[in-house]
């Protein structure tokens, strides 16, 4: 009985909102129709429906509850890490039973997937916004650092230690590939003498083979290596900084990051 009451409490507001929305729409539609006439009123209703009717009150409420669940999940991750994420603990914080939340997320893994998807999408959008303005690899690297510093726990969820027992679906790989594609394009646009893989090396030959990780990007091996070098070295510096390993070492992590970028931008000599 307790579970049923909780589920009714979580979903009940959606029913109330739906009823209120229908009542309001009916009254408004009646008034508008009387003043404007059938044809004009129909056009107005169509336009309003395209905007507000895209999501029903129930759907809006469901999205609101899911957003609240994710907010509590991020707080849990900040306090104890992603491996300790618990829907039952979130339910307790929200004042409902555990089974009530399974109406919104089928389980822990689905919730983690949603958080990872949100994180990757946020970073991919930030990187792409810079890329379309012509940002070079260094510019994209600054976007990465700013994004990571804004929310370290979000960064570590996608680039830190994998969550035990969790396996991300392939759709997540697609979003992460967008980030690499923008970096590859920026690296391919650099001057030919920019740092890259010297031809004839085993790694150069390896990069010339089909590259699933690059999602079929047409960048030449030198640009591929350049992008990998940027990605691995800068993530290394960022991960150490965000984990607090530079604390007490009497240097500015931002300057170290910039020095790494300078080294990556220097021509081969």
Task: Give the label of every model feature segment.
Residues 64, 68-75, 79, 110-130, ...:
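Alpha-helical structural segments
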Residues 2-11, 17, 185-269:
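C-terminal peripheral helix-coil segments that are non-catalytic and often amphipathic
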Residues 159-172, 250-251:
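Short helix/strand-bridging catalytic loops that position acidic/His residues to coordinate divalent metals
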Residues 51-58, 105, 109, 165, ...:
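A short, mixed-charge helix-start or loop-turn motif at secondary-structure junctions
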Residues 138-160, 173-195:
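Helical hydrophobic small-molecule/effector-binding pocket
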Residues 68, 72, 76, 80-110:
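Helix-turn-helix
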Residues 128, 149, 153-157, 239-242, ...:
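Charged/polar positions within long, soluble alpha-helices
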